[in-house]
């Protein structure tokens, strides 16, 4: 029994440590695809990964490529900042870096005067947090951290940016 348990645990660990490849992405959901893109960056894997309004794209070290369609979802990567940012339209999980890493923010998303989302988020080691939003809509995004606030219009159309880096926090 102990040997079976050890073999099971070793097998599970090997599955988690599986090298990045298109096969790893087969059959996984959107949340897991996002988690893999972020994990591969944090582990220093040489995988180029980015998201457009239509899909996740991956380019692996061996030259193979993969695409995971977003369907009805739209993924917006957001990097609030105080002093330093970069221009961005398409979010590259493999290289985009925001200023405020591993920090917590209060987020509200409004459609007109109607609040459609209120949540707490934490930026990752890359300085970004991600929001899943319905497609083909216009919103106002509000981000707060203590008495620091930023607000910006965002859209989720097929030509909309997937990377928001111009969300400057100001004291209020």
Walk through the language-model features, giving the residues of each.
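Extracellular beta-sheet/turn segments enriched in Thr/Pro/Gly and aliphatic residues
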Residues: 68-70, 74-82, 158-172
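Mid-length scaffold segments of soluble, non-membrane domains
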Residues: 70-124
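Sec-dependent N-terminal signal peptides
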Residues: 4-13
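Short acidic/polar inter-strand loop motif in beta-rich domains
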Residues: 146-152
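Glycine-centered loop-to-beta-strand initiation motif
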Residues: 123-131
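A short, solvent-exposed beta-strand micro-motif common in secreted/extracellular proteins
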Residues: 137-146
């Amino acid at each position: 029994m102990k040997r079976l348990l050890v073999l099971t645990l070793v097998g599970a660990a090997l599955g988690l440590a599986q090298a990045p490849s298109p096969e790893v992405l087969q059959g996984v959901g959107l949340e897991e695809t996002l988690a893999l893109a972020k994990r591969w960056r944090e582990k220093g894997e040489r995988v180029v990964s980015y998201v457009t309004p239509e899909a996740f794209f991956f380019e692996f070290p061996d030259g193979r490529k993969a695409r995971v369609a977003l369907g009805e979802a739209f993924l917006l990567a957001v990097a609030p900042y105080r002093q330093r940012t970069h221009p961005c339209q398409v979010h590259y999980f493999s290289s985009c870096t925001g200023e405020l890493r591993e920090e917590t923010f209060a987020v509200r998303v409004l459609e007109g005067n109607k609040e459609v989302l209120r949540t707490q988020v934490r930026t990752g080691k890359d300085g970004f947090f991600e929001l899943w939003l319905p497609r083909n809509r216009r919103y106002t995004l509000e981000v707060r951290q203590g008495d620091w606030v930023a607000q910006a219009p965002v859209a989720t159309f097929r030509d909309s940016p997937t990377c928001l880096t111009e969300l400057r926090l100001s004291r209020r």
